[in-house]
């Protein structure tokens, strides 16, 4: 679950981290009033959406008058912002963040993620702030410095100083950086985060560090014990199909293709998408129904997949381990009958009672194509989309 920038900065303030004075506003009038609270300009106005690249898309602007603030708010509130990180529809802009402008001398980067290979929280810092860290990692990886947090000892001040020295910081900036590092680590661990990022972390012309931007991603599996973070959730920023899938404990991610995929198991789902691509198709989604692929969940999965108007065919790929394939077949037949599927459905069953499941599909009289293998399934679903 992602948070907005203003929400991230609210958390920063609770933990004593430096950030510009700012207010999240829902109307143009509130935006003007926020500027008055902050004081004399210039100010920075920012669209609040769960996506990067806002500046290049016109969603961030430095303004010198309240008239400009009102004009910006009137232009963006209620509209959708399209960036390189969104789809063609963009994300809805429901709030504008108005902040005091900051005089920037240098931009840095500081962030943390859970590193699965080391099974630790790893902090990353770089002198290349203000740009995508993925781009820095690809083009100049030597400019990214890392420290891993020991799960028993926790974050240590010397680790913050180590990163500060590698960034070339001196004097009071080392102390300020270490405080920010320790604060971010505390937020990350206490709030069960999956991602925290300050990009950029800036050195002002007065020689101080300021968290100019903030990005937080909470671990959805830990939200049950983070009630205040749950209340910050903005479902308007989420794909409606993904939100519906989450209610049924289905792992769904919308993509841009036209072949709907329903699979049990995340690894098998990724492999299914790969082989569809290999044979010239484009997956419309990632959907893992998990081990408990009951008729009800399969039915709901079909509804979610078919709510995407781009879907021209559906590929169901089920490996029956604990779950019997004949029961899965019953679920598929029931779901197709209930939902009224009007596109070709290709089904590949493998494992426990696979032959019985395939026979049930063949005898159902429905527009269901039984595939003999995963390759055969991919070829058939691509051919169905192409009308062959």
Swiss-Prot record:
Binding annotation for substrate = 264, 321-323
Is the Ligase keyword given for this protein? yes
**So what does this one do?**
Succinyl-CoA synthetase functions in the citric acid cycle (TCA), coupling the hydrolysis of succinyl-CoA to the synthesis of either ATP or GTP and thus represents the only step of substrate-level phosphorylation in the TCA. The beta subunit provides nucleotide specificity of the enzyme and binds the substrate succinate, while the binding sites for coenzyme A and phosphate are found in the alpha subunit.
What would be the name of the gene that encodes this protein? sucC
List the Gene Ontology MF annotations in alphabetical order. Answer: ATP binding; magnesium ion binding; succinate-CoA ligase (ADP-forming) activity; succinate-CoA ligase (GDP-forming) activity
Name the pathway: Carbohydrate metabolism; tricarboxylic acid cycle; succinate from succinyl-CoA (ligase route): step 1/1
GO BP terms: namely: succinyl-CoA metabolic process; tricarboxylic acid cycle
Which SUPFAM superfamilies does this UniProt record tie to the protein?
Answer: Glutathione synthetase ATP-binding domain-like, Succinyl-CoA synthetase domains
Its EC number is: 6.2.1.5
Does the keyword section mention Nucleotide-binding? yes
Q: Origin organism of this chain? A: Enterobacter sp. (strain 638)
Question: What cofactors does this protein use?
Answer: Mg(2+)
Keywords per UniProt:
ATP-binding, Ligase, Magnesium, Metal-binding, Nucleotide-binding, Tricarboxylic acid cycle
Q: Which NCBIfam families does this UniProt record tie to the protein?
A: PRK00696.1, sucCoAbeta
The protein here is known as Succinate--CoA ligase [ADP-forming] subunit beta
Q: Cofactor note from UniProt?
A: Binds 1 Mg(2+) ion per subunit.
Catalytic activity from the UniProt record: succinate + ATP + CoA = succinyl-CoA + ADP + phosphate; GTP + succinate + CoA = succinyl-CoA + GDP + phosphate
Family affiliation: Belongs to the succinate/malate CoA ligase beta subunit family.
Q: Which InterPro entries match?
A: ATP-grasp, ATP-grasp_succ-CoA_synth-type, ATP_grasp_subdomain_1, Succ-CoA_synthase_bsu_CS, SUCC_ACL_C, Succ_CoA_ligase-like_bsu, Succinyl-CoA_synth-like
GO CC, one annotated term? succinate-CoA ligase complex
Where would I find the ATP-grasp domain in this sequence? 9-244
The entry's Mg(2+)-binding residues are 199, 213
Q: Subunit notes for this chain?
A: Heterotetramer of two alpha and two beta subunits.
In this chain, ATP is annotated as bound at 46, 53-55, 99, 102, 107
């Amino acid at each position: 679950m992602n948070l907005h920038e203003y929400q991230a900065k609210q958390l920063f303030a609770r933990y004593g981290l430096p950030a510009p004075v700012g207010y999240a506003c829902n109307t143009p009038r509130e935006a003007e009033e926020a500027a008055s609270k902050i004081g004399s300009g210039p100010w920075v106005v920012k669209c609040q959406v769960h996506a990067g690249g806002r500046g290049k898309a016109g969603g961030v602007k430095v303004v010198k008058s309240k008239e400009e603030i009102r004009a910006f708010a009137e232009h963006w509130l209620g509209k959708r912002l399209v960036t390189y990180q969104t789809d063609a529809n963009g994300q809805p802009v429901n709030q504008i963040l108005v902040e005091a402008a900051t005089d920037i001398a240098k931009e840095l980067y500081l962030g943390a993620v859970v590193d699965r290979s080391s099974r630790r929280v790893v902090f990353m810092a770089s002198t290349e702030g203000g740009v995508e860290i993925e781009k820095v990692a690809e083009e100049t990886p030597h400019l990214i410095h890392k420290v891993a947090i020991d799960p028993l000892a926790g974050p240590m001040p010397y680790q913050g100083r180590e990163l500060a020295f590698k960034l070339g910081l001196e004097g009071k900036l080392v102390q300020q950086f270490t405080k920010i590092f320790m604060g971010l680590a505390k937020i990350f661990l206490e709030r069960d985060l999956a991602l925290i990022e300050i990009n950029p972390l800036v050195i002002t012309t007065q020689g101080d560090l300021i968290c100019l931007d903030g990005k937080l991603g909470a671990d959805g599996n830990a939200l049950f014990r983070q009630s205040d973070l749950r209340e910050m959730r903005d479902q308007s920023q989420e794909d409606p199909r993904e939100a519906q899938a989450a209610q049924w404990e289905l792992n769904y991610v919308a993509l841009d293709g036209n072949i709907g995929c329903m699979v049990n198991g995340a690894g098998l789902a990724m492999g299914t998408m790969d082989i569809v691509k290999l044979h010239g198709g484009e997956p419309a989604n990632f959907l893992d129904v998990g081990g408990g692929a009951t008729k009800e969940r399969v039915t709901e999965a079909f509804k979610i997949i078919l709510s995407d108007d781009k879907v021209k065919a559906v590929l169901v790929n089920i490996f029956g381990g604990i779950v019997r394939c004949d029961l899965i077949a019953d679920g598929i037949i029931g779901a197709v009958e209930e939902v009224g599927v009007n596109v070709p459905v290709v089904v590949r069953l493998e494992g426990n009672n696979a032959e019985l499941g395939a026979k049930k599909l063949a005898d159902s009289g429905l527009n269901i194509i039984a595939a003999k293998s995963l390759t055969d399934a991919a070829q058939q679903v691509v051919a169905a989309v192409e009308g062959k």
